[in-house]
Design a protein with these regions (language model features):
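PLP-dependent class I/II
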Residues: 1-141
């Protein structure tokens, strides 16, 4: 934070505005993309974070577990897109973000976090990737 002490308030304000504008556009495009390919996914609209929370509870078969799905995507999940290349999507399951009593349903079980920490051209593939990976996973489960 010491380096920021030498920056003017106006320069910091301009930098923050640039960041907001950059992410605002990306958030809008990705949100619309997720809703277009999977209208029944519950998709957050981030305000202060650089990730989406996507809940698949309305479309997942009973017993869906985000940890197992995220692991499957990392280890086995690969889908081809129109360019002929195979891709996967790395996500963070949200099971561990909630506390509760043993035996209670964990709302994070069907929730996944998709980060914006990727180049925008690849990030634009996320809605189609998640849809295809989710459908492939559910078909084999």
């Amino acid at each position: 934070f010491g380096a920021l002490a030498h920056e003017s308030h106006a320069d910091l304000h301009n930098w923050y505005e640039q960041q907001r504008d950059y992410y605002r556009k990306m958030i809008f495009e990705l949100y619309e993309g997720f809703k277009e390919v999977e209208p029944d996914f519950i998709v957050s609209r981030p305000e202060a974070s650089i990730y989406f929370v996507i809940d698949v509870r309305k479309v997942a078969k009973p017993g869906f577990d985000g940890v197992e799905f995220a692991s499957w995507c990392a280890e086995h999940g690969a889908v081809s897109l129109d360019d002929g290349k195979e891709y996967t999507l790395l996500m963070a399951p949200l099971n561990g973000f909630y506390s509760g009593k043993k035996g209670e349903d964990n709302p994070g079980r069907t929730q996944l976090r998709v980060s914006f920490c990727e180049n925008p051209d690849l990030l634009r593939l996320a809605p189609e990737l998640l849809s295809k990976l989710f459908r492939a996973y559910e078909a084999q489960r």
